[in-house]
């Protein structure tokens, strides 16, 4: 049984709308990801997803874009 998960990934050095769109586009391409919303001021990425997507591969995608994961 697949179940939806909602997680928040906090990152460093998120400053502008261009970065926000870059991250949203990258994560939305992943199979299993339903929704991505980002709070620039908080440096928070909110993701709704189900299997086969998981928190590790979401964080890796963000890291591969050059962002440091805080927690």
Where are these regions (language model features)?
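Conserved short beta-strand edge segments in small beta-sheet-based binding/regulatory domains
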Residues: 65-71
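Extreme N-terminal starter segment of soluble prokaryotic enzymes
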Residues: 5-7
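Short acidic amphipathic segments
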Residues: 24-39
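Short, Lys/Arg-enriched N-terminal segments with co-localized hydrophobic residues
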Residues: 1-3
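A generic structural motif
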Residues: 43-48
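Helix N-cap motif at beta-to-alpha junctions
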Residues: 50-55
């Amino acid at each position: 049984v697949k179940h939806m998960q909602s997680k928040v990934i906090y990152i460093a050095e998120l400053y502008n709308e261009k970065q926000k769109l870059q991250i949203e586009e990258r994560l939305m391409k992943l199979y299993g990801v339903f929704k991505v919303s980002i709070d620039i001021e908080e440096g928070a990425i909110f993701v709704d997803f189900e299997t086969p997507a998981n928190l590790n591969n979401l964080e890796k995608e963000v890291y591969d874009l050059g962002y440091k994961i805080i927690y």
